Amino acid sequence: MIPANSTIRSLFLEGPAGRLESLLNAGSEKATHAAVVCHPHPLFGGTLHNKVVFHAMKALNSFGFPVLRFNFRGTGLSQGEHDHGIGEVEDVRTALDWLKSEFHLPLIFARFSFGAAVGLRAACADPQVRATIALGVPIAPVAADTEEPRVYSFEFLESCDKAKLFVSGARDQFGPRAKLEALVASIPDPKKLVVIEGADHFFEGRLREMREAIEAWVKEAVGSQPSVLGRL
């Protein structure tokens, strides 16, 4: 069993738009992977402290993996301005590059909502990323009367051959089940879709089930076992 490490390190990464506020949950000396988790849309309150992001971090950290969370540009103490999902892709690359140089381990890339939309492309193109986890994929168009109307494209997934986990709520208002099932069916293996009954986009009241889905899949895809302490 891998002992848990409860150390949390606060740091700033040097990104193309300035410093990115970050938190690193330390891993075990026997860690086999390192991971990053991206937060949801900053214009709608998304930060690295989001509940879904936190529980995804805890799931990955329970395996002894060091896990990085960061605020996208213009969010929290991160410098720069929100760039409508364009410059944020470079923020993801900054986080991935930092993890590579810091740990020299294969990477797992996890993200929620907006983080999934902007980060998947960077993760699929990075040879050191071995597995990806998408939570609450915003596959439905964002309403035109919102502050940032947008339709996200996931066509690049058709050439992404990394291990892929999708976790969605059956009542996700931004990721209709039929559309998500069609997307997953169109992309190459290895892949897995877990739909949590009764859950909405934010997994309200279903965070434990979401976390358990991540842990079960990591055991399958990576072959690691979570620490009992890491589940606290």
Task: Map each language-model feature to its residues.
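N-terminal cap/lid segment of alpha/beta-hydrolase-fold proteins
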Residues: M1-K30
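Short, surface-exposed "cap/lid" segments of acyl-processing enzymes
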Residues: S28-R69
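Alpha/beta-hydrolase active-site loop
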Residues: V52, H82-E102, R121
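Gly/Ala-rich beta-loop-alpha elbow adjacent to hydrolase catalytic centers
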Residues: R111-G119
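Acidic catalytic loop of the alpha/beta-hydrolase fold
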Residues: P141, A170-G175, H201-F202
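Short beta-strand/loop motif that positions the catalytic acidic residue
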Residues: S159-D161, F166-S168, D172
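Catalytic histidine neighborhood in serine/cysteine hydrolases
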Residues: S186-F202
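Catalytic histidine-centered segment of alpha/beta-hydrolase-like enzymes
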Residues: A199-R211
